[in-house]
Amino acid sequence: MLTTGRSFRNERQINDAERKKIELVFHQCDVDKKGYMSREDLKIAVVMLFGYKPSKSETNILMENGTIRDCKGVPLEPFATLMRRKMSAEDPYEKARQIFSAFDVHCRGFLKLDDFKSAFKRVAPRLQERTVLEAFRHADQDSDGHISFKDFENIISYGLANTCTST
């Protein structure tokens, strides 16, 4: 089978802020300053970058693809290449859907203020309630007391757009 190395999916471009984050995470996880990531370091890095613990098989694949000859782990350049590839394949809509679903613990298809408060209490326990209320009001575009997925996605997209343009 002949392949060109390109996929038919639309993969997004990685911006400078994301490149810097990958490098920063590498250095934070390489606590012993070995110049490479061990298997455990790599798992922690994936959690920091993508918010989930990779499976054993995913970790094996990352280790196999990132380890170079005469090195016990994954050095910065192969790590950065793997993480950029992984980031560019991420679907922002799916990510927003996952976050929304985590907030929507009652599976109603919308968020109420209590859902919002509860979610923020878990992820940012020191955040003032007033700030959470302001965020809710900002996200509730039609002021009906509910944040639909569309409202939520607009806020997430706005945040991503600002992250991408400010470097």
Curated annotation (Swiss-Prot):
Gene3D superfamilies: EF-hand. The gene is efcab11. One of its GO terms (molecular function) is calcium ion binding. Transmembrane segments: none annotated. It comes from Danio rerio (Zebrafish). This is EF-hand calcium-binding domain-containing protein 11. Residues 17-52, 91-126, 127-162 form the EF-hand domain. GO terms for biological process: microtubule cytoskeleton organization. One of its GO terms (cellular component) is cytoplasm. It comes from the Eukaryota. Keywords: Calcium, Metal-binding, Repeat. InterPro entries: EF-hand-dom_pair, EF_Hand_1_Ca_BS, EF_hand_dom, Myosin_RLC. Ca(2+) binds at residues 140, 142, 144, 146, 151.
